[in-house]
Amino acid sequence: ALVTLPEDYIDALPEGSTALLVEFSADDQNQLTQLEQKLNGHIAKLESSLVANQLFTTDSKVIANLWKIRKGMFPAVGAVRATGTTVVIEDVAVPVAKLAQVVKQLHQLFIQFGYDEAIIFGHALSGNLHFVFTQAFETASEIERYHEFMDAVSKMIAIDYQGSLKAEHGTGRNMAPFVEMEWGSELYLVMSKLKQLFDPQGILNPGVIINDDNKAHIKHLKIMTKADDLIDKCIECGFCESVCPSLTLTLTPRQRIAVWRQISLLQQKHQAGVITIEQQQELNTLQQDYQYFGIDSCAATGLCGQQCPVGIDTGLFIKNLRTKSHTDGKVSQSIAKRFESVSTIAKFGLSSLQLANKVVGDKVMNHTFSAMSKVSGNLIPKWYKAWPAGAKPTSIINNSEKFTDKVVYIPACGNRIFAADNNAQDKRAIQEVIISLLNKAHIEVIIPQQTDKLCCGMPWQSKGLNDSADAKRQEFLKVIKQASAQGKWPVITDASPCALTMKVEEENDAVSIYEISQFVAEKVLGKLAVNKTDETFMLHTTCSSIKMDDGQFLHELAHACSNNIIIPKDIYCCGFAGDKGFYQPELNKAALAPLKAQVPNNCSRGLSNSRTCEIGLSEQSGISYQSVLYLLDQLSCSNV
């Protein structure tokens, strides 16, 4: 593989240069070493023709990055395509001995038909090539250019090189007109008769593989309508879908974008006065249904943007739609201005609900809250068994010892409002735990007096209420700058979403803002003696931790505490998304559907670093989730 090279160096590469990514494995280290030596011997023979060489590595991060480059080639073309064009990918195979010759001839066809942006990649060992190019379908001349190019490519592969027009992927409609040319009339007739026997009415995937229309590939073409600058580069590759919490509930990011493009296309027709009655009905239905399927059921945490090869954050797009449909009304502004009072009322309400639940039970509470939620138009949240009581006032907990080293600590809203999980072994407030840990490391904890009125602004931002969000952020920044002596002392917060919000928003870096896991891993862990346990724990990495540091510090703390940490498969964003889990618990339930079955019988505790996420995790898993700091404090003592 090519090493990372400056752009001007890459531009200066000889014409026809190729990057080859080689991966091999063995049953043991000895065999692996022998294989590496053998391969290096072969590579040495090619020294004169090598432009650059990356040494073989067993570093999992380096390997992942190399594969990320390779897998990102197809979608990356979409990032530079003109708005409104479509990315086309084809998949062919030829005899390995002819591979280099085919690559050269493909490049010649790209030049001949004006596909200057086209790229080729594939699997050299199998003689398999993927070529990607962008295509506009808005004019007859563009469609004809595409038609002639596909004719030329198909003839070259199937006839000239006796290759296959499809290797890894299905024939589809684009190659269906060329199947007879590839296999010959006699075999094509056999295929057609088999199709007729199995599917006499032609209802199973019609027009795919067997298609008598030799122009089927240039009909019913999909138009990539210009819809929004944030999403116009999307090529609908679907890389984002696996991590989306609404994958099995409503729409994925790719589908949200595809549906919005259709809405935009129909809106353009409506504005131009050329929309049909049927299209108007479709537009009305899509706009109505998109509110829940596209907007309301989106967690908007942006984890999809981490997977997207061109960095499209569909969550941000959805937030912008919320901004357009919501305005900062008097209620949201009043809550922002009176946040301390609202928090106090919320804590009282939570504690009262716990008392009521003890009297009437979960079943009655569930029915009551479901009815109230329905009557209120979902303004009243649903009932959760995992709903905690209200937390203690921060002022009661603020009892740090005095030390030379100091840190400013802003407890997040969720940890100031929600008490520890009802079924937790350790029911201390998280503030007590953090003060205990930091004092063990001889660090004084400063909690500003104004803390209870502070918020990073994320609850408003996620709903598109940007004015209120910005007001709370500015208030937050003003307090921490003063409390930290203009940046002399670092600032920590105990919820990863809040830390991410403030890290993104703090422009001048006058104050160092840490998510608590990072601060403890870097500044505290080395000053503790940890009595590591063999107890089994589930670990959930929050979206914000993934976006900040790929969960590195959270994982480091968890593994410092236990030899048995389980990271469940197919769990990404938990779908709780701040307070959304209270109002749309179906999203949290769908996102965490695979979780409970992966909790072993000997496991009763889960670890994370966001209180609201932990509420949903506890509800869906059947075990109690808490901040990893509880466990670290329980197992550690000072060694300074």
Question: What is the predicted function of each stretch?
Answer:
Residues 203-208, 239-263, 297-324, 501, ...:
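Iron-sulfur cluster-binding cysteine motifs and their immediate structural context
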Residues 1-167, 171-211, 222-248:
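Noncatalytic alpha-helical scaffold of FAD-dependent oxidoreductases
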Residues 44, 50, 57, 64-120, ...:
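Non-catalytic terminal/interface segments that mediate subunit docking, oligomerization
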